């Protein structure tokens, strides 16, 4: 199932123009009778017109949101879906989401101050 979700997001992100789902969470993953996972609910999806552009609106569900969405004026790209997908994987492994005590909470202030989400993902400062 995890691979199905990743392939679904890859499909969205590699389309021309690419699509950012923006609300990837467990309740938006449907399972077929054969056990295949399918991404659903594209109500918040955004079509990106440029590979270099950043989206600037706050959307999604808090427990699955990437840290860059917590900024007062968020700028983000397809990587927010990757982060949300990781939260779905966490939920699949743990059978629940953590009680708002995310390991990256310590980074929250740094991200809001610096708006440097690229170094958050790459580890480069």
What positions do the PLM features span?
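Conserved activation segment of eukaryotic-like protein kinases, specifically the C-terminal portion
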Residues: 55-68
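Catalytic-loop of the protein kinase fold
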Residues: 16-31
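C-terminal lobe of the eukaryotic/viral protein kinase catalytic domain
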Residues: 97-125
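Protein kinase catalytic-loop region centered on the HRD/HxD motif
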Residues: 7-19
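Conserved end of the kinase activation segment
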Residues: 69-79
């Amino acid at each position: 199932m995890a691979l199905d979700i990743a392939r679904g997001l890859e499909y969205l992100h590699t389309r021309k123009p690419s699509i950012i789902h923006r609300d990837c969470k467990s309740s938006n993953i449907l399972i077929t009778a054969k056990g295949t996972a399918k991404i659903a609910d594209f109500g918040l999806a955004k079509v990106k017109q440029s590979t270099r552009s950043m989206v600037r609106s706050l959307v999604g569900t808090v427990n699955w949101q990437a840290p860059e969405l917590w900024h007062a004026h968020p700028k983000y790209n397809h990587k927010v879906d990757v982060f949300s997908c990781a939260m779905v994987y966490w939920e699949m492994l743990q059978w629940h989401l953590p009680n708002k005590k995310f390991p990256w909470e310590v980074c929250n202030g740094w991200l809001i101050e610096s708006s440097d989400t690229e170094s958050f993902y790459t580890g480069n400062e």
